[in-house]
């Protein structure tokens, strides 16, 4: 999502079907963020959404990184890509994983900001290197 709005608008219940609509709403309730726009956007193509859901489930929550580190990586990617929606969504999710407001401010500064552990600095540096 950019300042101008989404390039592809999230689908309505009619666009995405009852199951995807329910998944997006339940996900939003569980995370405290409201209906998940990403789910409703990808859900416009049901096969894409199902494949993405399997993929994303292997990364989060089924990934090998601890949840806090996963959230730091997602926040850094969202910041570098200028994706305000994803950034704000994961600020909320990150709080549950132990990401503080100070961490969020440092994510914006990047891996050279003070206060990161050596491991966190490596993860954020990897994000920056993959981005550039």
State where each predicted segment sits:
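Histidine/lysine/aspartate-rich catalytic loop segments that bind and position anionic ligands
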Residues: 91-117
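Acidic, glycine/proline-rich low-complexity segments that act as flexible tails and inter-domain linkers
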Residues: 1-65, 95, 112
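Generic structural signal for hydrophobic core residues of well-folded globular domains
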Residues: 42, 59, 77-81, 130-131
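Acidic/histidine-rich alpha-helical segments that form the ligand environment
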Residues: 117-132
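Conserved alpha-helical segments that form or flank metal/cofactor-binding pockets of metalloenzymes
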Residues: 69-71, 77-101
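Structural motif
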Residues: 64-69, 115-120
């Amino acid at each position: 999502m950019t300042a101008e709005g989404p390039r592809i608008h999230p689908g309505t219940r009619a666009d995405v079907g009852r199951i995807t609509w329910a998944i997006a709403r339940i996900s939003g309730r569980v995370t405290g963020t409201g209906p998940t726009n990403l789910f409703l956007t990808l859900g416009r193509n049901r096969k894409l959404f199902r494949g993405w859901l399997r993929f994303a489930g292997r990364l989060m929550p089924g990934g090998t990184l601890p949840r806090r580190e996963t959230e730091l990586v997602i926040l850094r990617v969202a910041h570098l890509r200028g994706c305000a929606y994803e950034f704000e969504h994961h600020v909320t999710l990150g709080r549950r994983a132990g990401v503080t407001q100070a961490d969020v401010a440092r994510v914006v500064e990047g891996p050279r900001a003070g206060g990161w552990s050596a491991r966190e600095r490596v993860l954020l540096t990897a994000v920056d290197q993959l981005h550039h």
